[in-house]
Amino acid sequence: ETPALVVAHGSIKRVSNFPSTFVNPRNIDIWLPDHYSKGKKYAVIYMHDGQMLFDSAINWNHQEWGVDETMGRLINEQKIKECIVVGIWNTPKRHSEYFPQKPFESLSQAGKDTVTKQLQSTGKTDKAFQPVSDNYLKFIVTELKPFIDSTFSTYTDRRNTFIAGSSMGGLISMYAICEYPEVFGGAACMSTHWPGTFTTNNNPVPSAFV
């Protein structure tokens, strides 16, 4: 059992092993700002790699993004509007869940084989690589978002719904806003892992995004 998270601002509500018909169950950590009230409505930011966001004590590398500190400070300084952050934990399928599926499927078979070999060489897959990011986004849009909107006091429109991540999380955030522009009004794609694999030599992936 993962210990309760320690945050500097606001509070965390955890849903353990959130079920899905599209992806494997995973923990969801919902950060609520200081003075959260059912009498107000809040924008929502969906963030990938949820276990890395709030508390370094639970992470493999003992580092965290400091999302609670940063969001709390920016809200208190009135630099951003009050919002909720939904931290979506990753799983061992992280690379295939975060890898944009339609660009991959647009590659020739030779291109797909090249990607598979490049990912096999770094231990990211032990078989033919197949992204499952379309199902990951269906999980967020059709299962997780309705739960968040029905459980917490949120604005549900695209102007108040955002998605964010770093590295492969940046890549899937880019894919999310392209696939669901009617759902997400903005995406923060930080240090985006544009190569998709771990080499730029003979890599067909970046051109597939164009």
Functional labels for PLM-detected ranges:
Residues 2-210:
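Non-catalytic cap/lid and distal C-terminal segments of serine-dependent acyl enzymes
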